[in-house]
Amino acid sequence: MLQVTNLGLRFADRKLFEDVNIKFTNGNCYGLIGANGAGKTTFLKLLSGELDSQQGHVSLGKGERLAVLRQNHFAYEENRVIDVVMMGHERLWDVMNRKNEIYMKDPFTEEDGILAAELEGEFAEMDGWSAESDAAQLLEGLGISVEYHDMLMGELDNAIKVKVLLAQALFGNPDVLLLDEPTNGLDISAIKWLEEFLINFENTVIVVSHDRHFLNNICTHICDLDFGKIQLYVGNYDFWYQSSQLARRMAEDSNKKKEEKIKELQEFIARFSANASKSKQATSRKKMLDKITLDDIKPSSRRYPYVRFTPDREIGNDLL
C-alpha cells in the first residue's frame, strides 16, 4: 500500500500540487491521466522518492518494496542483460553478490561461514534460487530470446534496451510498481503480454500512459490530475470519461437552475423591498438568496487538437 497525505509542490510561482490525499491499495491498477505538463511524471517521482515534496508526505507499507521503470538506456552498458533484470530487486542483488564474494575468500574463516549462512537464508526467503529463471521468463515474455540474455547492454539497440528495463521493473514481484509510459517502443505482442502480466499482478500498479486502449484493458481505477488536484474514479479510462462528463453536465445543470432561482429572487426583492406589505417577504427572499452558492466549475486544463479550415471567400453558385 502507498499513501499520500497532504502532498504539495510548487515550482517558482507555479503550484503543481496542493493538498493531495490518496491511498493506493493492493490488487488495483491506477491509471494516472492529465494534460501534458500537468505533472504526471513529477508525481511518480514524488511517489518513488526521487523528488522531495515541499508539503505532506508519501508512506510505503512497512517492509514493502517499490519498483520503478527506469528511462536511462545507457546506465548498464557493461552489465549482462540477465543481470540488469535481477538488479531490479536491489536487496536480492546485493545479497547475491555479497555471498558470492564471501565464498571466493581465501582463507575462508569461521566468521565468513556464519555470515554466508545468514545470507543464504535471506537469499532463500527472497526466492533467490529461482531469480535467474524468473528474469529469463520475463525477458522471453517481452520477446527477448535467450541468445540475448548473456550479452552486454551496450551491445543492444535501444528497442531491446527498453524491454530489458521494463523486465527489470517487473522483476521480483514488487509490492508497488510505478510505470511511466511502459508501452513506448513496444511492439504489439509485447504490449499484449504486458497487459496480461498487469491484469494478473496481485499488488499495486500506478501507470502513466497516453494509450487509452492500454488503460482500458488494465486499470481498475483512474486518477485524474487537473489543477493540482487528483480525483479518483473507480473503473477504466472509458468509465472515467463518461463519469466525468456526466458529473460536469450535472454541475452545469445545477448551476443553471440556481441562476434562474437567483434571478427570480432578485426580481422579487427589487420589486417589493420598498412595499410595506411585502417587505417581510422581500427580507425572507434575501435570506434565501444569500444561501444560494454556485458550484465552482473550472474548465479542464486539457487541450484537444483540432484542424480548422477557413475559406478565403465563399464558393460561387455557378460552375464554369
Model-derived regions, located:
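ABC ATP-binding cassette signature C-motif
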Residues: 1-255, 312-320
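Flexible nucleotide-interacting loop at or near the entrance of a catalytic core
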Residues: 113-130, 246-320
